[in-house]
């Protein structure tokens, strides 16, 4: 009997069945609690299971409920709402980050198995987009915030996005909302792997970080920051002209604070039409080998729209920035859970790409 019912849903609402199956498998309460026991440091379970907190927060993140307080009566949690908030405000950032990594690993396995990847941007390299996010200012619900007009910034994060898989591989959360993005790069550097290709905006054009990537046999394409020092080795050479702009390149030398030197390629795109920020040229630095065409390098950077689009989807489709939560750890946990939900959605999109290979699934399938 149940198989007939399931078959009807599979036929009439296949995506809904896929989402339900993924949620039941990847966010299964027993599995999540078992995972939590393996990663927790100072936290403990006591009255409220970690899986219950995940389920509660997902109701808010997925816009099923407007706030934690509204979701609480429907959560099945028997502990008081005060205990729930206490649990949320003490969640370790390593747990929030670890959950994103855990689900990303599961997503990568599934997407690879079904061959649902997007076409690679550059064969032989694992392209990773890096970008930052500052959570929006929160309401003044906490007593400590009621004496100030300014909204408190509950945190900041760096996100690593894989365009081939279409998922967030990692999130690096920070409780200091006013911290500079570059201050979080040391943690990101520990995750760099051989043949990675990190594509980044100028905020991440930091010599120590770029040299760390290079030292680990990985590569970078980064927009040059105005304060980044370099030594030209040859004049700019015109590579090509097009209707949108002219492409130039020159070899330059960069020197690390330690005195180490590397030769990189400086790519200049002179635009015929200014960007929305008024820029008439874009300057890139890369340590990719000479056999990689200059136009490909410019195209790699242009594809940063993929991570920008992912952030836009997170903001418009999910409640990723819970401005009702003044507790930094709680707000950052909500942000990380939004990426967990996004990655589950990415698996569904990958399955559709694998099934309908001759169709532009990313452009034609409605996300609602």
Specify the residue positions occupied by each region the protein language model found:
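Extracellular beta-strand-rich solenoid/capping regions of secreted or surface-exposed proteins
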Residues: 146-148
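Primarily marks folded extracellular/lumenal domains of secretory and cell-surface proteins
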Residues: 110-116
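Single, function-defining residue in the core of a domain
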Residues: 1-65, 79, 84-91, 98-106, ...
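Short alpha-helical "recognition helix" segments of helix-turn-helix
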Residues: 69-75
């Amino acid at each position: 009997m149940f198989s007939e019912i399931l078959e009807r849903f599979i036929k009439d609402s296949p995506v809904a069945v896929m989402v339900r199956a993924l949620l039941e498998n990847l966010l299964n309460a027993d599995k999540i609690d078992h995972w939590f026991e393996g990663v927790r440091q100072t936290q403990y379970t006591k009255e409220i299971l970690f899986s219950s907190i995940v389920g509660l927060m997902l109701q808010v993140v997925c816009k099923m409920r407007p706030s934690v307080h509204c979701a609480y009566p429907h959560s099945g949690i028997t502990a008081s709402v005060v205990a729930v908030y206490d649990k949320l405000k003490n969640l370790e950032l390593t747990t929030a980050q670890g959950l994103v990594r855990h689900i990303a690993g599961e997503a990568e396995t599934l997407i690879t198995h079904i061959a649902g990847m997007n076409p690679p941007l550059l064969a032989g390299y694992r392209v990773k987009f890096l970008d930052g996010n500052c959570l929006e200012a929160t309401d003044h619900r906490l007593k400590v915030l009621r004496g100030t007009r300014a909204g408190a910034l509950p945190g900041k994060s760096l996100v690593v996005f894989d365009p081939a898989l279409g998922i967030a591989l990692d999130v690096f959360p920070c409780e200091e909302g006013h911290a500079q993005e570059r201050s979080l790069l040391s943690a990101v550097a520990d995750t760099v792997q051989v043949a990675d290709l990190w594509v980044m905006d100028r905020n991440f054009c930091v010599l120590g970080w770029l040299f760390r990537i290079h030292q680990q046999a990985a590569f970078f394409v980064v927009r040059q920051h105005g304060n980044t020092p370099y030594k030209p080795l040859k004049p700019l050479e015109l590579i090509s002209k097009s209707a949108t702009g002219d492409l130039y390149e020159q070899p330059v030398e960069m020197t690390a604070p330690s005195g180490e030197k590397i030769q990189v390629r400086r790519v200049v795109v002179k635009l015929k039409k200014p960007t929305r920020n008024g820029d008439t040229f874009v300057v890139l630095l890369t340590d990719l080998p000479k056999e990689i065409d200059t136009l490909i390098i410019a195209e790699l950077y242009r594809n940063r729209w993929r991570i920008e689009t992912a952030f836009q989807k997170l903001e418009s489709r999910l409640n990723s920035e819970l401005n009702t939560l003044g507790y930094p750890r709680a707000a950052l946990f909500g942000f990380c859970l939004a990426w967990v939900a996004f990655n589950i959605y990415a698996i569904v999109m990958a399955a559709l790409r694998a099934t309908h290979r001759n169709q532009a699934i990313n452009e034609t399938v409605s996300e609602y």
